[in-house]
């Protein structure tokens, strides 16, 4: 758990840990919406990530930050969808166990 703000070094370390997992997604704009709203909008397309959301960024950084001893214990999270999928994906890629707890009311589309 973070007790202080991440440093530039922390951010660089996270990039190294996740560069083989996280996809460099495009930033797009829309002439239609720009004209409609009278301003230039930019859309970061994180939906192109392996798990369909930006959540893989933090999940893979957290999972790949674990020590060997911590990784042996596996990981767990509670989620309504995207975070759970990202933790499960990162754990799979690291070769460790993951328990994902989801409410019964979660949309079936969110369960991979």
Language-model segments: what does each one mean?
Residues 1-112:
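PLP-dependent amino-acid enzyme catalytic core
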């Amino acid at each position: 758990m973070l007790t202080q703000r991440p440093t530039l070094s922390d951010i660089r370390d996270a990039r190294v840990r996740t560069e083989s997992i996280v996809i460099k997604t495009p930033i797009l704009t829309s002439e239609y919406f720009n004209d409609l709203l009278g301003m230039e909008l930019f859309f970061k397309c994180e939906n192109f990530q392996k798990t369909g959301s930006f959540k893989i960024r933090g999940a893979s950084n957290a999972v790949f930050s674990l020590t060997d001893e911590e990784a042996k214990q596996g990981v767990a999270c509670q989620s309504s969808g995207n975070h759970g999928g990202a933790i499960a994906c990162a754990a799979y890629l690291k070769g460790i166990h993951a328990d994902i707890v989801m409410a019964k009311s979660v949309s079936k589309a969110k369960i991979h």
